Amino acid sequence: MPHDLDTALAGISGILVTPYDDAGEIAPARLAPILDRALAAGVHMPVVNGNTGEFYALTTDEACTMVREVAALLDGRAPLLAGVGRGVRDACRLARASAEAGAAALMIHQPPDPFVSPRGTVDYVKAVIDAGGGLPVMLYLRNDAMGTQAIADLCALPGVKGVKWATPNPLKLAAAIDACDPGITWVCGLAEIWAPPLYAVGARGFTSGLINVWPERSAAIHAALARGDYTQANHLIAGMRPFEEIRAEEMNGTNVTVVKAALLTQGHDCGPTRPPSAWPLTDAQQARLDGFLAANELA
């Protein structure tokens, strides 16, 4: 089934968790009801091997399996965005596996290597694009310290369709948008809470981990922003802010923990998170999460 990739990129990029079984092995089949619920609510583009999917806790073999299995679960119902990254050879291998699985586009994680040069990043992205065999690419930018010109150089590479902007710097985003081809889609990579200020300078769409638990709220926020109703969007965001506040604790180390704990409360056992993510929630965190879920009739 054909899909409009540009429309999907400017929609909700729903970052799926990676479920584990009782032995700690990946269990992608457990995503089926979560994925079905997200699609029914209107999530535009599921994302596999993102940070909410504990990408850096997975082996490359596991990440390759996840993209194949999620593509099979999705079965063409929406375009699949597949995260790739780590060492360049791992990233290229995962790009090839993602293309073979039927992903619609690649999301290239910004290299976390301590010794990264802007021009080396260009070479890295070129290699991954080549390995992807022509799949469109979204760049995942979590650090804008490379500067506007370096960002523009990356966006000028053939195949780059969008940027997942995950830094809380709207003015730098505005400068980057001005410096790049107007055909590039700039997506808020900091979830629902940061969507309004980044929309104000030109971003469209946002990433979401909430979609695993409450996709209807994510869809309502996107709809409000799409019609320019910032008052309603902010009202809806206020209602889900406690969820994101708990996720941001412990240096963001409870980010995935909260999502998996909420899913467990909803009857979807996706296992624990892997270290170095925190597991389980503290009693105080769990009590706040339980209160949030109860207040919104989510459990």
Give the location of each predicted region.
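C-terminal alpha-helical cap/extension of soluble enzyme domains
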Residues: G11-V17, L35-R37, A41, A200-G202, ...
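Alpha-helical structural signal in soluble globular domains
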Residues: A41, T65, E69-L73, A97, ...
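Short, flexible micro-motifs
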Residues: G14-V17, A27, G53-Y56, R86-V88, ...
